[in-house]
């Protein structure tokens, strides 16, 4: 797996091409990702890199985390993220910083984030079911899901049946987004289109799996 970066969704805007075409873009701020730990097959059974980003007051860091950051001689961040390594990446050491400059040669990215929570929703909104008749004798079942199973055989509702429930607030990955611009001076990456999550939410970027 290629190097991944943790960023923050700053919002959306648009830019214009030389031909005057308006391109909607999402601005992702990628502060330097500080490496707190490098895991190897010999010591941990697999290859991975652990990073942190941002900052956090010392009073908000527990003793275990404070010791972990101190061992790596890295400033405490707002969280820890771990990414698997394939072994063919550049050499990464504890204390190194991964920046947007590592993505200058990448044209397509996959962006992972937590989708906006919608609370408890019905089957129509949650699963895009069709509504039932508004009239013609239908009085109470306009937005009902309809049948949820068979008869005495199997005599139960199948696992995974699409029904009403909590919608959103789940990990979502949008694949193969075009990288429109990389601003190394301001630590920004502009990608074409929308990415999951709300403004100021954490997102993870990696080179597009289907474009490698």
Curated annotation (Swiss-Prot):
PTM annotation: Methylated by PrmB.
Alphabetical list of SUPFAM superfamilies matching this protein: Translation proteins
Keywords (A to Z) from UniProt: Methylation, Ribonucleoprotein, Ribosomal protein, RNA-binding, rRNA-binding
PROSITE patterns the UniProt entry points to: RIBOSOMAL_L3
Highest taxon of the lineage: Bacteria
Biological process (GO), any one: translation
GO molecular function ontology, one term from the record: structural constituent of ribosome
One GO term describing the cellular component: cytosolic large ribosomal subunit
Keyword Coiled coil: no
PANTHER family: 50S RIBOSOMAL PROTEIN L3, LARGE RIBOSOMAL SUBUNIT PROTEIN UL3C
Subunit comment: Part of the 50S ribosomal subunit. Forms a cluster with proteins L14 and L19.
Protein's recorded name: Large ribosomal subunit protein uL3
Source lineage: Bacteria, Pseudomonadati, Pseudomonadota, Gammaproteobacteria, Oceanospirillales
Primary gene name: rplC
């Amino acid at each position: 797996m290629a190097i991944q970066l943790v960023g923050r969704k700053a919002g959306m805007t648009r830019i214009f091409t030389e031909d005057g075409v308006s391109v909607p873009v999402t601005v992702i701020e990628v502060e330097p990702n500080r490496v707190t730990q490098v895991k190897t097959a010999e010591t941990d059974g697999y290859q991975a890199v652990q990073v942190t980003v941002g900052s956090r007051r010392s009073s908000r860091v527990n003793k275990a985390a404070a010791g972990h950051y101190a061992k790596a001689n890295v400033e405490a961040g707002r969280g820890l993220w771990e990414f698997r390594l394939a072994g063919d990446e550049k050499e990464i050491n504890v204390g190194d910083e991964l920046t947007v400059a590592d993505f200058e040669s990448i044209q397509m990215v996959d962006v992972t984030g937590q989708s906006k929570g919608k609370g408890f929703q019905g089957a129509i909104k949650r699963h895009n079911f069709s509504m039932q008749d508004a009239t013609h004798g239908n009085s109470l079942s306009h937005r009902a899901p309809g049948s949820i199973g068979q008869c005495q055989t199997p005599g139960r509702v199948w696992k995974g049946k699409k029904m009403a429930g909590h919608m959103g607030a789940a990990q979502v990955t949008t694949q193969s987004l075009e990288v429109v611009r990389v601003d190394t001076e301001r630590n920004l990456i502009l990608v074409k289109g929308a990415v999951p999550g709300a403004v100021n939410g954490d997102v993870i970027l990696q080179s597009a799996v289907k474009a490698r």
